[in-house]
Curated annotation (Swiss-Prot):
<dbReference type="InterPro" id="IPR001021">
    <property type="entry name" value="Ribosomal_bL25_long"/>
</dbReference>
<dbReference type="InterPro" id="IPR020930">
    <property type="entry name" value="Ribosomal_uL5_bac-type"/>
</dbReference>
<dbReference type="GO" id="GO:0006412">
    <property type="term" value="P:translation"/>
</dbReference>
<keyword id="KW-0689">Ribosomal protein</keyword>
<protein>
    <recommendedName>
        <fullName>Large ribosomal subunit protein bL25</fullName>
    </recommendedName>
</protein>
<dbReference type="InterPro" id="IPR011035">
    <property type="entry name" value="Ribosomal_bL25/Gln-tRNA_synth"/>
</dbReference>
<dbReference type="GO" id="GO:0022625">
    <property type="term" value="C:cytosolic large ribosomal subunit"/>
</dbReference>
<comment type="subunit">
    <text>Part of the 50S ribosomal subunit; part of the 5S rRNA/L5/L18/L25 subcomplex. Contacts the 5S rRNA. Binds to the 5S rRNA independently of L5 and L18.</text>
</comment>
<dbReference type="InterPro" id="IPR029751">
    <property type="entry name" value="Ribosomal_L25_dom"/>
</dbReference>
<keyword id="KW-0687">Ribonucleoprotein</keyword>
<dbReference type="GO" id="GO:0008097">
    <property type="term" value="F:5S rRNA binding"/>
</dbReference>
<dbReference type="InterPro" id="IPR020056">
    <property type="entry name" value="Rbsml_bL25/Gln-tRNA_synth_N"/>
</dbReference>
<dbReference type="InterPro" id="IPR020057">
    <property type="entry name" value="Ribosomal_bL25_b-dom"/>
</dbReference>
<comment type="function">
    <text>This is one of the proteins that binds to the 5S RNA in the ribosome where it forms part of the central protuberance.</text>
</comment>
<dbReference type="InterPro" id="IPR037121">
    <property type="entry name" value="Ribosomal_bL25_C"/>
</dbReference>
<dbReference type="Pfam" id="PF01386">
    <property type="entry name" value="Ribosomal_L25p"/>
</dbReference>
<keyword id="KW-0699">rRNA-binding</keyword>
Amino acid sequence: MKTIEIIGYRRANLGKQASKQLRNDAQVPGVLYGGKEQVHFYTPMAILKDLVYTPQAYFVTLNLEGAIYNCILQDIQFHPVNEVILHIDLLQIFEDKQIKMDIPIVLVGDAPGVVKGGNLVHKKKKLSVVAYPKDMPDTIPVDISGLDVGQMTRVSHIKAENYTILAVPGTPVAVVETTRALRAGAAEAEGKGKKK
């Protein structure tokens, strides 16, 4: 899996006023947990853009004044009005412990139903996955090359190697729906067949 490096600094002052001052200085307060102790830190807001505003999933290398931590983005809080990042939580990861992440789904192939005029609907964009860090996939490929109009692919059709998908097996991932034009064409063809 791809990794993004975040450079941060340990926080000396904790509390609302200190956090507010950090945000005014375009810094984002955060907490690293999952290791021996919680580490409070802050990082420039601009550094977080590639991690937060993307559909991709990443591992994070957190560099706190020379100390390196491998982690993942666990939680993020946004301002309710202007979508500014208010706070981030990072979870430290270890090679011998499984982690849970939301991994994006990538549709692979061309659905014959789309060629016939159907509409491909991507029902799920991400799935929660549990795996050891070395086995965590960048994306979950889903083959749609066999989907005709009215057919769908489900979570149960995904071949997961070395990871577990946390979703109901019957959950639809992608479906080729009938469009109005396709229904109208079918009704028109049926009407012509009855007139003969």
